[in-house]
Amino acid sequence: KSNGHLISEYKGWNSLLVTKFDIKKGKILDSNYISSHYPELNNKQKIFVITKGVFQMKHEASESLLGEYDAVDFVNGSQTYEMKPLEDSIIFMISAINLTSQSGKSTFFNFKKDIKSKDLWGGQCISRPYEGQGLTLVLFDLKPGFKFEDKGHENEQITWLIFGKMDFYANGEHKTLNSDNGVDIGPNHIHGGVSGGAMGFDAFFPKRQEIKYKK
């Protein structure tokens, strides 16, 4: 715990970092906290995505309410922001230590409302890929019984579930994924699995360059 937040984080082999903040109503997560606790991410792209609850967001001179599957992409570290949950809430931060410093405006979006669904895996999987300057983040929804296999790629990939389960394998190792665990896939490792019905995220660094992952 830190500052009233229950924090879980994982740093991958190519510096990809996924952090889960489980925040109680009334507590605050802001840019000062992130800068002081994650100095290695200063001036680096950070994508925040809400998977539970509602946040009151203050950003620069504006204020808004953010709910489930709302996300904000802070391209660099110059923005100031404050996120206050109006109920017990969960928000993820995705970044990478080895990202180059970037510039640009922040992007607010909702994965389900604003990101077009794509058929990346043949009909049984709804994928919504967001292409950032340095990261790719994909929300996926897998139907029960869906089987898939990827022959591998150079990009680091961290996969985790919001709900459901999936029997997963990577580089010959097998594991059942649920909302409490995930997998970090190594370079060019063959990976795949069978869905028991699941929704979750794939984060990639560097970002995917294939057309199907583009905006």
Language-model segment annotations:
Residues E60-G77, N171-N188:
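Short acidic-glycine-tyrosine-enriched beta hairpin
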Residues D30, M57, F74, M93, ...:
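Short hydrophobic/aromatic-rich beta-strand segments that constitute the beta-sheet cores
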Residues S62-E63, N76-Q102, P187-K212:
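Ligand-binding loop in jelly-roll beta-barrel domains
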Residues H37, N42-K44, T51, Q56-D70, ...:
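Extended, compositionally biased flexible segments
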Residues N32-S35, P39-L41, Y81, K151-H153, ...:
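Histidine-centered active-site/metal-ligand motif
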Residues K1-S31, S36-Y38, G67-E68, V72, ...:
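A short, N-terminal "cap"/entry segment at the start of jelly-roll beta-barrel domains
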Residues E40-Q56, D141, G152-D167:
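Short, conserved beta-strand element in jelly-roll/cupin
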